[in-house]
């Protein structure tokens, strides 16, 4: 008969318990956007997971492309210009144009 593992088996060196990193989700922001469009609409949990996965994938693609742009230009810092270039490369033409306009508006709103 197998014995259950003790809690000390799950501890790292030094006697501390390992903690899981909390998963980062965009659920709050997705709900805010949905409510700003139509206050009476809601999303099911499954739909929220799908939209969250879509946003995470897009974020990952833009971040990877921005890192590549920085590396190609032999720079050390990621600026607004590199992000704009990454968005233009990742998104289709019309969608990229709208994303650029909204991003510029958000940055100017946050800085003022």
Swiss-Prot record:
Q: Does the keyword Repressor apply?
A: no
Statement: the UniProt record of this protein carries the keyword Nucleus: yes
Pfam short name (any one):
Histone
SMART domains xrefs: H2B (SM00427)
Query: Which of UniProt's keywords are assigned here?
Result: Chromosome, DNA-binding, Nucleosome core, Nucleus
| GO MF annotation terms | DNA binding; protein heterodimerization activity; structural constituent of chromatin
Q: Which domain of life is it from?
A: Eukaryota
Tell me the subunit arrangement: The nucleosome is a histone octamer containing two molecules each of H2A, H2B, H3 and H4 assembled in one H3-H4 heterotetramer and two H2A-H2B heterodimers. The octamer wraps approximately 147 bp of DNA.
Its biological purpose is as follows: Core component of nucleosome. Nucleosomes wrap and compact DNA into chromatin, limiting DNA accessibility to the cellular machineries which require DNA as a template. Histones thereby play a central role in transcription regulation, DNA repair, DNA replication and chromosomal stability. DNA accessibility is regulated via a complex set of post-translational modifications of histones, also called histone code, and nucleosome remodeling.
Q: Per its record, how is this protein called by name?
A: Histone H2B
Task: Report the source organism.
Answer: Trypanosoma cruzi
Q: What is the lineage of its organism?
A: Eukaryota, Discoba, Euglenozoa, Kinetoplastea, Metakinetoplastina
């Amino acid at each position: 008969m197998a014995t259950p593992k003790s809690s000390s088996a799950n501890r790292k060196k030094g006697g501390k318990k390992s903690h899981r990193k909390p998963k980062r989700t965009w659920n709050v922001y997705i709900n805010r956007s949905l409510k700003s469009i139509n206050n009476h609409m809601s999303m099911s949990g499954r739909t929220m997971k799908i939209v969250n996965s879509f946003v995470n994938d897009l974020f990952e693609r833009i971040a990877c492309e921005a890192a590549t742009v920085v590396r190609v230009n032999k720079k050390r810092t990621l600026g607004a210009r590199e992000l704009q270039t990454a968005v233009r490369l990742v998104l289709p033409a019309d969608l990229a144009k709208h994303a650029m306009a909204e991003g510029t508006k958000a940055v100017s709103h946050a800085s003022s």
